[in-house]
Amino acid sequence: MIGWTHVCVSALILRKYGPEVLEEILRKAGYQEDIKFDIQCYYDDTETMRIFRVAATVLGLSVDDMWEMYGEFLITHACETGWQKMLFCMANNLQEFLDNLNSMHYFIDQIAFKSEMKGPTFQCEPFGESGLKLHYFSFRQGLFPIVKGLVRKTARTLFEMDVKVCMLERNQERRKSGMVEHVIFSVEPDDNHRKGKRLFHKFRNTKTTENAPSFTLSSTILVGLRDFKNIFPYHVCFNKQMIIEHIGIYLLREYGLENKKTLKVSDLMQLVQPSDIQLTYKNVLSYLNTLFIFQLKHHSKRNEVQEGSSEAFQQPLVLKGEMMPINDGNSIIFICSPHVTTVRDILNLKLYISDMPMHDATRDLVMLNQSRICQMELNKKLEETMKKMKKMTEELEVKKSQTDRLLFEFVPPVIAEALRAAKTVPAQEFSDCSVIFTDIPDFFTISVNCSPTEIITVVTDLFHRFDRIIEKHKGYKVLSLMDSYLIVGGVPNANQYHCEDSLNLALGLLFEAKQVVVPKLERSVRLRIGVHCGPVVAGIVSQQKPRFCVLGNTVNVTKSICSHSSPGKVLVSNAVRTMVTKHLKSIFVFNANGYLELQSGKVLTHFLEKNEKCSVWDIVDRDKATNDSIDGYRELHSDNGTEEWQEATVAAYRVISVVDALENKQSRTRKALTRLRSVKRKFRTIQSNDSGVSVSEPNVESAVCSIM
């Protein structure tokens, strides 16, 4: 069926039952939820039937009731999509409307939608004093309930009446094109539209030949046969024996019929529509309300002139029109026109617009339809352009989301939003924040024993776990490089309890690291962590590839504290310990470690043991196993594997020494001795720069700041 059917039933379900029900029906019918049916596309009948069966099941209706409801909504949807005026000007009463259903169906299928599909046919006749009998023929089985809903809604919408539609008979008939379903309906009007009532003419045709006005015409104004042939150049008149009595002037001349005395209709042309009947006089009388289409069996003289050449046209002429009984039913005249709708059709037949009478609407139809085709081509290009733009917009949104994700990965969300808005983000000084620095003391041992792929796998797993804990405890990852991790608290968003959150974060990092096992060594990863608090300066570096950087002596001190920490331990400065003791939010337990001699001076440090108000399981947001301790600190500070790591480290240095010897390289000891001799020679000289540092001596660590 045409896609208009799918669009219409989708609109029906959406309007009456809502988008959720429509999505459920489409999903169960095998379609994606965001599918858009194309009005001009043709869908297999099995797809259409499946949609209606699924819809009936979901809505709790029978399939016949679903088709009947669709028939009622069909008229509503047609009126809302631009067909309202055409429907209202179809007929003056319901009977005439039903009589013209066949021609309207043909127009919609063949001209509006350019479809070759076979639609149903209808016959309407009076039934009793006030009723109508409607015959429905269709090659598709089971669609007859549509007619009941359609007729009821048509009567109510177009003629303001209520009718009762009942099925009288249903059977199968064998026609020329195959088996068709024949259903007979009775249509009864309401009380205001019955015979004898003022509005009866709105229901049934009251025109009869008996009450038609008669005029006394002078014989001098009667139309002669020659004039009639010129007025209707394509007409064909035949008698009950199907023998042609006279024919239009165009057919007479172009097909060489002047000298033919006895010519049957079947010798000149073959019936195309209605396709399911035999061409007999009786059948023609039965289908007077149906559009007839004939195809001529021979080519005109125009086409035979160039027969055999590349320009020869082989398409025969097709005539379309209506049958009208004349001479008290003893003859039938076929008033018709060439069945052409576009300029291309005329060219293929070697016809010309001048071959059609000026009163023939086919001339206007061809020119209007040609204009419509041009408009449709423009609309088609516009639709394709819109689809491309929509696709490009979707791709742009995907790229934008990827860019935003990368931007939010490197800079805090607040700053990222400002950068997206093209605002300048100046550097800020934060007088109070905490800094965490972590590294893996056994990274050298891991790199010797594991392949590069295995190292990447371990680090990736580790950092994924870290990111989750950082987000939970309101920290911000400034940098992750090799085995090092720099995290800040209270930057860029101020946080009154940044020290407490940072210490909980440090405990969580230690625990998560223990959950990662190094391949080949089968040992848990050990971290060492340093925590310090103080002022920093933070800002964006680079415009094309923005990075969030933290500068200041606090960063240097934190790095130094981390380097003096022990594997599996968190070493914090006294400033951090003093800060957390001011608040009663958490109660942390520390062990003194003494003073560290750093370049910036002595720093008192402590080892962090635990948070007495919060268990490890709460910190890492994980469930406690059956055999685990209540607070989790036994597992956190377990020294299992320490000796194995020491043995593995010694073995790793031994391997490197052997490799260096085999490659004829200097050992690490020899390199250190060479370096010491070089330094000794430099100290013997009196050359120095203005700051007192020897020439060529690298300034490894600045006492002022460090850029991460």
Curated annotation (Swiss-Prot):
A single GO cellular-component term on record: guanylate cyclase complex, soluble
Domain Guanylate cyclase: 434-562
UniProt catalytic activity: GTP = 3',5'-cyclic GMP + diphosphate
Cited Pfam families: Guanylate_cyc, HNOB, HNOBA
Gene3D superfamilies linked to this entry: 6.10.250.780, H-NOX domain (3.90.1520.10), Haem NO binding associated domain (3.30.450.260), Nucleotide cyclase (3.30.70.1230)
CDD domains cross-referenced by the UniProt entry: CHD
Main localisation: cytoplasm
A GO term for molecular function: metal ion binding
Keywords for the protein's UniProt record, in alphabetical order: cGMP biosynthesis, Coiled coil, Cytoplasm, GTP-binding, Heme, Iron, Lyase, Magnesium, Metal-binding, Nucleotide-binding
Catalytic activity, EC: 4.6.1.2
Annotated localization: Cytoplasm
Main enzyme class: lyase
Source taxon at top rank: Eukaryota
PROSITE patterns: GUANYLATE_CYCLASE_1, GUANYLATE_CYCLASE_2
Positions that bind heme: H105
Cofactor: binding comment: Binds 1 or 2 heme groups per heterodimer.
The keyword Metal-binding is assigned to this record: yes
Binding locations of Mg(2+): D439, D483
Assembly description: Heterodimer; with other soluble guanylate cyclases.
Function as written in the Swiss-Prot or TrEMBL entry: Synthesizes cyclic GMP (cGMP) from GTP. May play a role in sensory neurons.
Extra remark beyond the main annotation: There are two types of guanylate cyclases: soluble forms and membrane-associated receptor forms.
Protein name: Soluble guanylate cyclase gcy-37
Species in which this protein is naturally found: Caenorhabditis elegans
